[in-house]
């Protein structure tokens, strides 16, 4: 199998300069409102060997703890970082790293099962465990001060795949519907010793457990390259190979 690399072209400053100085509408300028991403080498099975995406963000900072810059926006959309849930084409929540859930106690508890028994690893080869789930909640609430999980007041480990989230104000539905699709998992073995996670940009700050891993950055060319972790991820085909 060919090397699986997802190429990301980042020309934010140039794009902003071109469009920021013109008051013309797309119709007046003759420029279409959108253009297809560049693809190369599509085979009969619909697999694209290379996909190039332009985005109006700089390549820095490169850390799971930020949603700014190109890397942060890619993770917001679950490239390197694995999210708890995803939304389908009908905007309905679907399982991802959280494979099932049950709302108990009139909305004050979420019993959630995670894919910690499916052989998923972090991009450095370490296994993804239920301790990473518990750690993620603690990190986001107590150090990153994120609002996504602010309604979760406690976490109890049930077994190696399941936890109970205690939720304030009966906000279980809110937490699942408005937050879980944006929550990225953090590897405990990397982040537990970081005193200031919001400012950490070490080489291992990019390690996630999502479908693509960051393999190369060229700041001068403003490009980032991602590599697919395999042909499938969580049972779904990764149709972009390189």
Question: Could you describe each region identified by the protein language model?
Answer:
Residues 47-57, 110-114, 136, 163-165, ...:
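Short, well-ordered beta-strand elements
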Residues 47, 59-67, 92-94, 173-176, ...:
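Short, solvent-exposed loop/turn elements at domain surfaces
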Residues 86-92, 181-238:
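Gly/Pro-rich hinge or "lid" segments in bacterial periplasmic/extracellular proteins
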Residues 1-51, 92, 105, 154:
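Short, low-complexity disordered leader/linker segments with a strong preference
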Residues 54-105, 138, 207:
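N-terminal lobe/hinge region of extracytoplasmic solute-binding protein
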Residues 149-194, 213-218:
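Surface-exposed binding/hinge segments that line
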Residues 100-144, 158, 164:
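Aromatic- and charge-enriched surface segment that lines or borders ligand/interaction sites
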Residues 56-59, 89, 106, 117, ...:
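Solvent-exposed coil/turn segments that connect beta secondary-structure elements
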């Amino acid at each position: 199998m060919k090397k699986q690399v997802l190429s990301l072209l980042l020309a934010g400053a140039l794009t902003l300069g071109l469009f920021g100085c013109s008051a013309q509408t797309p119709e007046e300028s003759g420029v279409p409102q959108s253009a297809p991403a560049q693809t190369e080498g599509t085979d009969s099975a619909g697999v694209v060997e290379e996909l190039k995406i332009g985005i109006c963000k700089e390549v820095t900072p490169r850390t799971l703890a930020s949603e700014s810059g190109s890397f942060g926006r890619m993770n917001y959309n679950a490239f390197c970082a694995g999210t708890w849930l995803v939304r389908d084409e009908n905007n309905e929540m679907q399982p991802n790293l959280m494979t099932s859930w049950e709302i108990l106690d009139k909305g004050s508890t979420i019993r959630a099962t995670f894919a910690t028994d499916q052989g998923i690893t972090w991009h450095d080869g370490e296994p993804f465990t239920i301790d990473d789930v518990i750690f993620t909640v603690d990190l986001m609430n107590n150090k990153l001060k994120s609002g996504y999980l602010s309604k979760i007041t406690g976490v109890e480990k049930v077994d190696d795949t399941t936890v109970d989230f205690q939720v304030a104000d009966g906000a279980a539905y809110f937490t699942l519907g408005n937050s879980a699709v944006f929550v990225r998992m953090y590897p405990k073995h990397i982040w537990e010793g970081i005193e200031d996670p919001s400012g950490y940009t070490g080489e291992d700050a990019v390690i996630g457990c999502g479908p693509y891993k960051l393999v190369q950055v060229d700041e001068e060319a403003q490009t980032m390259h991602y590599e697919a972790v395999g042909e499938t991820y969580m049972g779904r085909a990764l149709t972009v190979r390189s």
